[in-house]
From Swiss-Prot:
Pathway: Pyrimidine metabolism; dTMP biosynthesis via salvage pathway; dTMP from thymine: step 1/2. Belongs to the thymidine/pyrimidine-nucleoside phosphorylase family. NCBIfam families: PRK05820.1 (NF004490), T_phosphoryl (TIGR02643), Y_phosphoryl (TIGR02644). InterPro entries: Glycosyl_Trfase_fam3, Glycosyl_Trfase_fam3_N_dom, Glycosyl_Trfase_fam3_N_dom_sf, Nuc_phospho_transferase, PYNP-like_C_sf, PYNP_C, Pyrmidine_PPas_bac/euk, Pyrmidine_PPase_CS. The gene is deoA. This is Thymidine phosphorylase. It catalyses: thymidine + phosphate = 2-deoxy-alpha-D-ribose 1-phosphate + thymine. Homodimer. Keywords: Glycosyltransferase, Transferase. Pfam families: Glycos_trans_3N, Glycos_transf_3, PYNP_C. GO terms for molecular function: 1,4-alpha-oligoglucan phosphorylase activity; thymidine phosphorylase activity. It comes from Burkholderia pseudomallei (strain 1106a). Its EC number is 2.4.2.4. PANTHER family: THYMIDINE PHOSPHORYLASE (PTHR10515:SF0).
Length: 440
């Protein structure tokens, strides 16, 4: 029987029972070009309003995985599990840059397929492109070699990995259907499955700087990812973490790379960044069979940080992908620095009771460190550092942050935006946990 995309779309629209084979045929048509952009848009909007049942979410994920190459690591003679983590994105979220090396130093292999920033959230690829010479788009053969030799490679999605997802996402991005939980789930997991990952630790953000607008939707997304990931044969767990302020006390591409290097070398390990990084990395070790339990995993992770083994893995990856061999030893020599720096003075004394993390991310975009639209050229040097945290006591005139900008005018604009993102009150706010819940 001839497969008609419009009939499949009608079933999704009307919430009729879906045959998983039809889901696969639709994705095959997307890959081959037989399904038009209009039909993809209609499908995406139908899913946005109705969502998909679990069986169809799994089928969509597997079909998108199978639309291109699927990496098989069995012939690579790796002596450890292939594991990964993924975040829904936020501000100052540089966990990938520290978790990957930590897990690699513990015996895991991490082929991390990452993305660029859009809107207020920073992208891991943008951070890495602040490193001179770093190749975020190596060939599949090079990806295999770097993962085998360094234990990790943080790179972008290639044209060969989940191409159907790439086409569907391009349509979602211009049709107001990005926020569909079913489509987000399939997009994330199809790329991880195509990379040959056997276990995934998912970081789902909650709060003012989160991708999902409410805590309830964040929890729903986490549950969907766990159920579909496990249903597709990849051991998956999700952690709900706080994004009511920047995760690290910095935001911006080169600035966050420097913060990651400081974390790995022990020069500075901010408590919130450490809490989330250890929680996710410990999940990766336990799911991958590299640690008996969370306590054992944390002990191993602490050991590779203190010994310098994790920093060495990061340096090895950077050099293998074309970056400077001495980046970890001499970051100031290689990372770009902004021409202007300006403190953001507190307007009054009191306690920091609220931070609009999304506004901080948009301030970085305004400086030129993020994209207002796809294709924008970035200034990798700009951003924010020394960000004050929720619950801190500040005096009038005390710096809330430092703005790094290309010139004095853009620094002044960002200074005003950052100051408005902070609300200072007379009483200290209630303390909140950085790790809210774990879903398995």
């Amino acid at each position: 029987m001839t497969f008609l995309p419009q009939e499949f779309i009608r079933k999704v629209r009307d919430r009729a029972p879906l045959d998983t084979a039809d889901v696969a045929r639709f994705v095959q048509g997307v890959t081959a070009g037989d399904v038009t952009e209009g039909q993809i848009a209609a499908f995406a909007m139908a899913v946005y309003f109705n969502e998909l049942p679990l069986s169809a979410r799994i089928a969509l994920t597997l079909a998108q995985r199978d639309s291109g190459d699927v990496l098989d690591w069995r012939g690579a003679r790796l002596n450890g599990p292939v594991v990964d983590k993924h975040s829904t994105g936020g501000v100052g979220d540089l966990t990938s840059l520290v978790i990957g090396p930590m897990v690699a130093a513990c015996g895991g292999y991490v082929p991390m397929i990452s993305g660029r920033g859009l809107g207020h959230t920073g992208g891991t690829l943008d951070k890495l492109e602040a490193i001179p010479g770093y190749d975020v788009a190596p060939s599949v053969d090079m990806l295999r070699r770097v993962v085998r030799d360094a234990g990790l490679a943080i790179v972008g999605q290639t044209a060969q990995l989940a191409p159907a997802d790439k086409r569907i996402y391009a349509v979602r991005d211009v049709t107001a259907t990005v926020e569909s939980i079913s489509l987000i789930t399939a997009s994330i997991l199809s790329k991880k499955l195509a990379a040959g990952v056997s276990a995934l630790a998912m970081d789902v953000k909650v709060g003012s700087g989160a991708f999902m607008p409410s805590a309830e939707q964040s929890a729903e997304l986490a549950r969907s990812i766990v159920d579909v990931g496990n249903g597709a044969g990849m051991r998956t767990a999700a952690t709900l973490t706080d994004m009511n302020q920047a995760l690290a006390p910095c935001a911006g591409n080169a600035i966050e790379v420097r913060c990651a290097i400081d974390f790995l070398t022990g020069a500075a390990r901010p408590a919130r960044l450490e809490a989330v990084s250890f929680a996710l990395a410990a999940q990766m070790l336990t799911m991958g069979g590299l640690a008996a339990d969370a306590h054992d995993a944390r002990r191993r992770l602490r050991a590779v940080l203190e010994s310098g083994a994790a920093a060495e893995r990061f340096a090895r990856m950077v050099a293998a992908l074309g970056g400077p061999a001495d980046l970890v030893e001499r970051p100031e020599r290689h990372l770009p620095r902004a021409a202007a720096a300006a403190p953001v003075a507190a307007a009054r004394a009191g306690w920091i009771e609220r931070i609009d993390a999304r506004a901080l991310g948009l301030a970085v975009v305004g400086l030129g460190g993020g994209r207002a639209k796809i294709g924008d050229t970035l200034d990798y040097s700009v951003g924010l550092s020394a960000l004050a945290e929720l619950g801190e006591r500040v005096e009038a005139g005390q710096p809330l942050a430092t703005v790094h900008a290309r010139d004095a005018d853009s620094a002044a604009q960002a200074t005003d935006a950052v100051r408005r993102a902070y609300r200072i009150g007379a009483e200290p706010p209630a303390q909140t946990r950085v790790v809210h819940a774990v879903i398995e």
